[in-house]
Amino acid sequence: MLSKVPATIEEIAAREILDSRGRPTIEAEVRLESGAHGIAQVPSGASTGSFEAHELRDGDPKRYDGKGVEKAVRNVTEKIAPVVEGLDAFDQMAVDQAMIDRDGTDNKKELGANAILGVSLATAKAAAAELAIPLYRYLGGPLANVLPVPMMNVINGGAHADNNVDFQEFMIMPVGAETFKEALRWGAEVFAVLGKVLKERKLLSGGVGDEGGYAPNLTSNQQALDILIEAIEQAGYKPGSQIALAMDIAASEFFKNGQYEYDGGSHSPQEFIDYQAKLVSQYPIVSIEDGLHEDDWESWKGLTTSLGTKTQLVGDDLMVTNPVRLQKSIDLGVANAILIKLNQIGTLSETLETISLATRHSYRSVISHRSGETEDTTIADLAVATRVGQIKTGSLCRSERVAKYNRLLRIEDELGDRAVYAPKIGLGPKHS
């Protein structure tokens, strides 16, 4: 949204704060001449694709085990501020391009994608504040009225938990709800029942994973799906028609020497594809993320041929919110959806460009958090603004996850009768 009257950026600041894992991250603040301002906090991933934009860390072992972000903070105040202060906050592309040009690298390793993204998002928030409208309305205009179906990560494995489950996330999606408020209640009720089931069977040895899901001691990935079905039914819901399943396999994490190592064995790509097809035939799985290694393009073609017409196949490590990687996927006919993580690409403008590219080629988009999160709720507004119809922001506990859900509840209330829950208009996961 542009205004004829410019909103001149007067001052940019940044500071080192903590994320949900107790690790440092960056918070950026953009203040306009009018006094309006925006603050944004940048998330961080545990399972990261090798093609992601560069997250700048200090590398000083005496501070935060080398994970400090004081370099990124200094880059905001010393290198970004001089090229952005004086620009119009309403011209998001100009602000982002100024930072990209100042960085001068393909992956933002000079300034750090975390430094650039903080300023990019804070600029949009300041612009929205200048107009005294919500961020979702500023970014999406009058059509920003679609509430996303949540992918609720209730069982954690892989890199997100210390247990013997290979797949990284097992999720529930309340596709049959009438409203987002109802969907959230359904998810919370299933999550509560799931906890009881796991405790009764003495399958819990600790608390929850990075994203708020349980990290139980299970014998296989299939056991996780069985327990989810049981929890859904015990909570009084119908698996599939009311609450569907989704998985983030994060296959790059257990790909070694051309083989996929899971369930205690080593398997060929075709065997792994067949295994996933078997799971889809046995369970109401509507979405699979990162089902194969991020560079195993030939196998991705096979997976898409096998499951692409019946299941949403999401590229995360495969595409890393990058329009170049997405375009390659489109050209090769690989996957049919993309996970959108702001810090994988590093600016709001490039994120919106990637979503637009996906939409033009009938690829679905899923707005996503990271495993290291903050109380920042930008992705909730972004999901509504872009009408993508899906959001992935963790489980039904841990306040950095719940903050996004609560923001969506407030947005739904603000929209009133104009609010539409995505599955009601066919904007949930693509599946048959």
Curated annotation (Swiss-Prot):
Cofactor: Mg(2+)
Positions annotated as active site in the UniProt record: 211, 341
Keyword Magnesium: yes
GO CC term (a single one): extracellular region
Compositional bias annotation for Basic and acidic residues: 52-64
Gene3D superfamilies per the UniProt record, alphabetical: Enolase-like C-terminal domain, Enolase-like, N-terminal domain
Entry-linked InterPro entries: Enolase, Enolase-like_C_sf, Enolase-like_N, Enolase_C, Enolase_CS, Enolase_N
SMART domains: Enolase_C, Enolase_N
Subcellular location: Cytoplasm; Secreted; Cell surface
UniProt key word Kinase: no
Entry keywords, A to Z: Cytoplasm, Glycolysis, Lyase, Magnesium, Metal-binding, Secreted
Region described as Disordered: 41-64
Coiled coil: none
Positions that bind Mg(2+): 248, 289, 316
Functional summary from the UniProt entry: Catalyzes the reversible conversion of 2-phosphoglycerate (2-PG) into phosphoenolpyruvate (PEP). It is essential for the degradation of carbohydrates via glycolysis.
Family of the protein in this entry: Belongs to the enolase family.
Name listed for the protein in its UniProt record: Enolase
Record organism: Synechocystis sp. (strain ATCC 27184 / PCC 6803 / Kazusa)
